[in-house]
Amino acid sequence: MKRIIFIILAVAAIMAGSVSCQKDNVISGDPIVPQGEVTREFLSQIRVGKDGGFQYWYQDSPALKELKAFVATVTDPNCKGYVPPQDRVATFDVDGTLLCETAPYYFNWMLFFHRYLHDSTFTPPEKDRQWASQAEAYVLANRKSDKNWGLKQQELQAIGFRGMTDVEFSAYVSNFINNESVVGLSNLKWGTALYWPMIEVVSYLVANDFVVFLCTGVDRDVCRVIAEGIYDIPKYHMIASDVNYVLENQPEWVEMISSEDYEYTPGEEVQRGDFMQLSTAINKIIKMRRELGQKPILSWGNSSGDYPMFHYTNIDNKYPHISFCLLCDDMKRELGNEDKAKNCKTDCEKNGWIPVSMRDEWWTIYGPQVERN
């Protein structure tokens, strides 16, 4: 009788293994929390290994289970859904997906306000300063901007930093994120306003040989500064909004078509120029096609601006594919938006995307020392 029971159990185990390629979950111990103020150095040490070990997610998180199952399938050569490492492309939005989004508004806007209104080293034209002042007052009062302001803001921001080298601009952004506090949340600078659970997700995918790109409306060089040292993502894996670059002595009339008419002087610096193109909504698809040459198999975003990326990931993809949508439903530990979260969840249900609840699935967002104020 014991022999029969053993055989039945063994057959059941074999059958279970043939159905699912998922490995056993690895459940970590007490989450690591720093003493005192959170630093970027601490964030850089948040890592998840190949087999899991997530600290900052609740272990019964439905989204985490979906993620682990998907990764287990596409990385197992014995599974039908196996994907070669070079094709395990994953794309992540930044604002609201990796970085605090509306505190009180998008990072690009807050950097723009700082440059035009609160930076004594820069004097913008008066009409531009007035526009920035009016926009700041509106944004601070409403946590949103007029839908027609986006292009103008990008153009003015590019002008505000025009002529800077990459070293100068990176230093400026680094100084901003390391010294400017997030509005509405205590004990939090912009440089540490990164979601701990999402740092884990990115590191988990990298450990499993995914090729990770950030796909965002944030300025490409800003994105590089924010990501540096936190995520194991190369600087050339940023699909983002762009400015033109010019040589320091290059006349304004020399553009791409006539660039052969300009003779480069060795040692000339490459400088930031005027605004070129946003990388939001459908432009994410266009830029992914141009820069990746293939579809991602995993995408992660948080709003309707990421829906084109989700559709691009999931329609006519030759490989297994999945998209996650982060819901801004935490009203206690984050500056959430319940209406937006509900709408996004409904859209997930309609389209087969995976909703991720900050409130219900994350043990922490920025660490327990950060509170709404």
Outline where the language-model segments fall.
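Bacterial N-terminal signal peptides
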Residues: 8-16
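Bacterial Sec-dependent N-terminal signal peptides
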Residues: 17-37
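C-terminal cap/substrate-recognition subdomain and adjoining C-terminal extension
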Residues: 36-53, 171-373
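Acidic side chains
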Residues: 24, 93-95, 306
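Alpha-helical substrate-recognition element adjacent to the catalytic core
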Residues: 33-254
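Positively charged n-region of N-terminal signal peptides that target proteins for export
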Residues: 1-4
